[in-house]
Amino acid sequence: MDTLRTFGSPSRYIQGQDASNALPEIAAEFGTRSFVLMDDIVSSAFGPAIRKAYDAHQSAAIFSRFSGECTLQEIGKQAKAAEREKIDVVVGVGGGKTIDTAKGVSLELDVPIVVVPSIASNDAPTSRLIVIYDEDHRISEVRKLPQNPDVVLVDTRVIAKAPARFLLAGIGDAIAKKFEAEQCEKTNALNFFGGRQTATALALCNSCYEIIRKHSAAALAAVEENQVNDHVEYIVEANVLLSGLGFESGGLALAHGLTRGLTAQKETRNALHGELVAWGLLVQLIAEERPAEFVSELVTFYEDIGLPTRLSKLGFNNLIDSQIQEIATVTHREAPYIKNLAIPLSVGRLIECIKEVERQ
């Protein structure tokens, strides 16, 4: 398998304003009983509309409350509840942790899954990966569905009602994919399907980057007013679909690897995944020895749209050398993706790269 070029994707991707109205009809393709998982915030904001849609379609839906953290205990609890109800399809409505918990239930019960993201802050919706946390909110393991979600249904009207910070975080997550995939190509790194990259994966990563550079500012301005326009549609597709396909079939490198070191620090508890990745990309570009002008131009773009350029923006208000040391050490020890960097990276060199970003 590791010599074969491999590409994976959801069976179907649907996006547009009021797309969630079609949820009962789509779920009914897999059976008559849906297990709909939502947290309290999403249930309060969008639950009534989803319930109304199911009632209008005269479909059975069992609604279950997500506790807020994707742990083995939460997956087990939800799977038991779904099994008791003899459900046919799992529907995950919400953010990344809700979606990953729904994927976990789908895996436990071997039933189809429909993913309905309420925010476009990361590329979890299209992925078959399930990121599981421990009770201390640290990543404990990553599991995989046998295939990507059956359907990803993205309602851009719902996305636009969320705070613009979530869309911006999705941009931060997505913008790194082009550069990480390029490093994986150089090192012949395997993607998340255990195969080599396809030209399609690299093309999607490039397209993702181009869309982000062209449409981000206008999309963020629209979402600040809870409006949907073509710029928003482009950015949502980049954040969710292109970024998701790009990372799984293209691979990851240092930008994502640094999240291991960052999330080990209590200062980043309130930072979003994409914010961490965006900063991590700057470190990766320094490690790649990219021209200073290139990095400086990207920093300017970050500043223009609001992405973090320094650790102070991620919660490190009084940064000290020992914190940089720990970020670098944990990343080097625990992040598997750093080996995908074309230039070998020691802990000492990683510390130097972080400090150079902080001097930008």
Show where each model-derived region lies.
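A short, small-residue-rich loop immediately preceding and capping a beta-strand
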Residues: 82-105, 109-119
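Active-site segments that bind and position negatively charged phosphate/pyrophosphate groups
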Residues: 192-307
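Short glycine/serine/threonine-rich phosphate/pyrophosphate-binding segments
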Residues: 20, 43-46, 72, 97-104, ...
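A glycine/threonine-rich phosphate-anchoring loop and its flanking beta-alpha core
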Residues: 107-200
